[in-house]
């Protein structure tokens, strides 16, 4: 075959042989295949012949090449070609013979006996699979036929391309089905007779394409095939026979591979026995055990669609493993799809994973044959990447040697179990050696202990061969005779054997094995071995060394490059090294390592050898082959790689010092499962950071004396010398003896400095002797040793003590260990590296050196590394802000013995879990326990007092998320965090505030005190801190996957996405971030399949509903019971169709007494309402939102109140208004506007967008009317971008409200009606109702005491009296507003029975009217002309003149309203002084405000706006407007006041501007010396308005006497009118304005003028009286002079010879002439 013609002949022979079997292959591909064979097997062309043995040898060489170089170096069709050719050469295949015998045994299908049940033929294929027979008349020439063969080779490439991924021949039973057609042809070629019926096994190609011809563009359809067979295949008959035998079909009933029979495909179930064995293998040995992988490889030969692989994995794997498999399966399919796209293969990603348009199983039958092979290959690769199961560690740990079991039998059982679990033989042997010692019985362990790290399994078996029952019996007898334990006898025998071995010199030579001499003098040591060369790898022509090769061409004649250094011999090749470490054991440095990428922060490190880690081994030290020192100025931080953490390898972080020169090692453990670490596997990384040196250092280098940041403690042998240690105590050095028996250290008095204080100790000191009243240090002393350990202690001082004693108070802080020869301690020391009779040491030389760090999980042994740490961040909750640092101590109340025992158990449990810690805190809160229904106790703490001292955080999630917002058709994963509060640590500074005490009965012992380290139950901020902590942990996932729909509420997390692959990828990353923050996912609560239980909902694929609630009605007895029931109903109401009118009977039950314990009974209507609720719960169907389609807000016109629903094919969320309306009267369209606004708000809140359209129950004309006349309607649609419609879909769910009567305003008009009847109405509080109809007056006396109610009565009478159209006017705006809305008000919300009755009667009359009406408002007491004003005035007078029979009644009515004084009443109503006084005295309010007159002189103005006094008074009941600024015109006493929020300058200026707008500008303004009046801004203001401003005497209020009395008058008037006022709403502005009205307009002087009349009225020209007056300064009398003002206690006199008037006290004035009617004169009201 070395010649060209022979190679062409060989290619032609292979082509003909394959074509004869129905397989057309391109000659070009065969030539390329043979070229690759020649490259891999250089000896193959020289053999000259090809037989089955030679071809199998070629296959082995191909597999070896594949293993060494990977799939990239092997063409994709190589294994397929090799398999096809192997089948052609193998005529004696056992499988072929077995199948032939099986076929021969079948009966002739034409003569099937009656006993055999008939078998229905498989169903016909879908239309896309049907083939059309080709035209048999076509004929081709030889040239055309050759071209067609070449094209057919390309066409049939997919038929056998799937074999490219197979590693071996398809010879197992499970692979028989997929290769059925190939084997059939092979049987025929081998001469085996098949049944004669051609329909059963047609001689057709084994894999006809079953897809439509249009799949491959540009190719003609293949030739047709005969009709399908009606008989079963052997596999089908085997399945039917198994079913007839009663085999139970397992969970694999959905696993159906695709078979091809002629030109049809059908879908047939796999043998359930095969799948059942697979499931058992997964549960017993694990999904990645070799036995399980072999079954998966066998299953992979079937043409399984994606759905079958998913179903198989779901049935065999656990929930977590299934998620991992599915995620990896999707990744593998994505890679294959990328390759297919590049090569033009039309097998897409959706086809491979079975999603999208290929989700249904029927559509998966149309795939190309090669697609099934790719799917199976991806599924197998994903299965192989599953992690090893942690439960298999327990299985291995259970394989233990029995007391009487031979050791070799035990090892055989162990090897058999490991072989089924582990595929790596080398790693399995390492594990077997370890378990062969650990799981052996005590006798074998004692014999193997000295050799456990030196010998192998064969040595172990040889050593323990003689250990049996007789051996153990002899050991027991020896122990009994010596009085020792069996273990001590075994140790004694071991030590004796060790000494004997050392003394004897009969051991053989280590080189040649012969006895009598040592290896150093062995004659064979220096003899060199002679090696013979094999085939030259360079020229492949002969057997010689490559360095000696002189050939210039290879065996095929190709030129070869020259050999460099042909005459010289180069150095031997070094060990293989890697960029991230050393796997060959050579010494490497940090400088030899390379970073993975340019941006890599750390240097990767790997293990140098195979290592097996088990949970029982604890932490192990792994060598890296990399040595220090680090680069100058740096220090190394050793961390684990994330990929290693995902595989279950825990890398413990450590610090590599800058001066460390030893080998850098990795501390690794496998806490959960068995882990195999291969040589060269990257598991850790070294991060170099700058070295910062602060403080003092010891002047020595670490070199290679220790690994990590600190050395192990030195172990010192006990000798005759005392174990002394020098300490530095408070800057002084002391040397002392280590005393492990001393509880506390003692310093000799002769070494005690005289300047250090000391005191008498309270307790005695006992030891060998006893010392009473010893001395002790008065203060804590700080000690420090030379290794840097430090601490504080309070030593005793004893006289006559020769040496200082360092007790356990110091030794415990130093971490000193004791070593004793007990068996327990010996076991620990042996694990740390101790050799018997040699002491400790790394090199087993007996030299005392620091031990290698090999800590165990139980923290026993020498040198403890912090096992609890890993390379995860230390996180805790945010610190809490506190109002005070004052400790809060609440005494613990006593507990009964039962509760105390329960509390102690719960506290110990929390202490063991690390949730609490011992405490000495100054805070204390009591604890108590309660027993749950299950019988378990629960620990609670009363933190109410502590909660009062903290700043409360706001709620981060004020509402519950709705599942409706989850995108429709999404894949969902729901997880629950386990004990979320208890996994979140408190801020360290906050722990002390949550301390508690555990009491004891009868104070038998001090209380044990603890404090919480995690979020405690009952703390106000615990929910908020929990939410924020979890939100921070999952924030990176939200940022990395912005399209992921992630819902987090407390400890529940939901993930949803339409891409399942991305969902599982995000879930995997989410678990990592939660784990890094210390949050634990409850594995049993991971939900990956429908239905999901989430936040009280049950989520199904297309809908969800609330979990069914059973309404309990037997306990409904009080108001509190009904309140709780309606609270629960209100929570689920947004997900139920429950209109307000359905629940109204239950709402009515809540009315009445507000006492929570007040009795309530369930009415018949209430029971009906509860039945409606239960029916709504049963029929609920809420769907998910499809954001790609339109959805909207529908307003349903239900009775009493409208109902809203966000709707998309089905309801998304129901919307209801409050059962208690905000106003007493609201029209129906106003309620519709309210629910529209609420619906828009909830759409944005829950779905993040406005509803695309809103459907309202109003036509377009009605909508126009609402936009014109309803403000709330316009506000509801403000800035709405969507569409408004009134067309409802034909859905029964939305049509249920259409039958209800819905009212729109029809009778009440907004505009007056032309030529209608004119009506005026009025009502008075005296119960008189007046009615004027077309100038005819009517009145009636009612029992109502409210004017508005009386007016409603009058309106009702008008509606009953006038049936035709009318226009009604009234002066009550309240009545008019109510009448314009009452027609469409569904619910009258007033609580007054009188008003409710009248409104109901008016509404009923309006609903029955035929003619429209108009209700208008007209202002009362208007001076405008016109008939409307006159008509209203007539109705108003009609309500008064009928009952005002005298002026006294009128005065009494006026006083009841305004509370004037008696003088004003006498002048206003012309009644006697005594009658007026009696009215005031009979008032229930006014007598308490009588004031006595105060006499004094205060300057007054001589005309209006001459002199003002301004001040500020405070009225607290006005709230923020309590600052009342008051100004008074001193001439007329006219008052001006305004309300402000302060009394600064700007408020004073605002008040004066208000006064100027009504009264003008004064000439002079007098104020006090307050800062608001003395500021520069106020002075500039007065100057701008040309006002002369002056102030009084500081701190003397008499200068402001007039305005001060005005303050009192205003306050008294406000108190008078405070009670029983129904004229207006009680606002501060209304009250103050009313008081000013009474004081300015209704308070009259002696002349009958009010302050307003005196201020704005005309000046009187009457003659001024003359008086004589006395000057108080000169005591001289002057006059007579005219009097300008004569007030109460003061007189203003204008001397004739003066320029200005004088103010004189009234007692210094005498009349010069008699005044007219002086006897009837009265003082000014002031």
Curated annotation (Swiss-Prot):
GO terms for biological process: DNA integration; DNA recombination; establishment of integrated proviral latency; proteolysis; symbiont entry into host cell; viral genome integration into host DNA; viral translational frameshifting. A motif (PTAP/PSAP motif) lies at residues 202-205, 287-290. It holds the Pfam family Gag_p24_C. The record marks 99-100, 256-257, 477-478, 713-714, 831-832, 865-866, 1446-1447 as: Cleavage. Residues 1313-1444 form the RNase H type-1 domain. Residues 821-866 form the G-patch domain. GO terms for cellular component: viral nucleocapsid. Keywords: Aspartyl protease, DNA integration, DNA recombination, DNA-binding, DNA-directed DNA polymerase, Endonuclease, Hydrolase, Lipoprotein, Magnesium, Metal-binding, Multifunctional enzyme, Myristate, Nuclease, Nucleotidyltransferase, Protease, Repeat, RNA-binding, RNA-directed DNA polymerase, Transferase, Viral genome integration, Viral matrix protein, Viral nucleoprotein, Virion, Virus entry into host cell, Zinc, Zinc-finger. Mg(2+) 3 binds at residues 1511, 1568, 1604. The active site is at residue 739. A lipid is attached at residue 2 (N-myristoyl glycine). Its EC number is 3.6.1.23, 3.4.23.-, 2.7.7.49, 2.7.7.7. A motif (PPXY motif) lies at residues 208-211. Residues 734-810 form the Peptidase A2 domain. Residues 119-128 have a biased composition (Pro residues). InterPro entries: Aspartic_peptidase_AS, B_retro_matrix, B_retro_matrix_sf, DNA/RNA_pol_sf, dUTPase-like, dUTPase-like_sf, dUTPase_trimeric, G_patch_dom. It catalyses: DNA(n) + a 2'-deoxyribonucleoside 5'-triphosphate = DNA(n+1) + diphosphate; Endonucleolytic cleavage to 5'-phosphomonoester; dUTP + H2O = dUMP + diphosphate + H(+). Residues 1665-1714 bind DNA. Mg(2+) 1 binds at residues 976, 1051-1052. Gag polyprotein: Late-budding domains (L domains) are short sequence motifs essential for viral particle release. They can occur individually or in close proximity within structural proteins. They interacts with sorting cellular proteins of the multivesicular body (MVB) pathway. Most of these proteins are class E vacuolar protein sorting factors belonging to ESCRT-I, ESCRT-II or ESCRT-III complexes. Gag-p12 contains two L domains: a PTAP/PSAP motif which interacts with the UEV domain of TSG101, and a PPXY motif which binds to the WW domains of the ubiquitin ligase NEDD4. Nucleocapsid protein p14: Nucleocapsid protein. Belongs to the retroviral Pol polyprotein family. This is Gag-Pro-Pol polyprotein. It comes from Sheep pulmonary adenomatosis virus. The gene is pol.
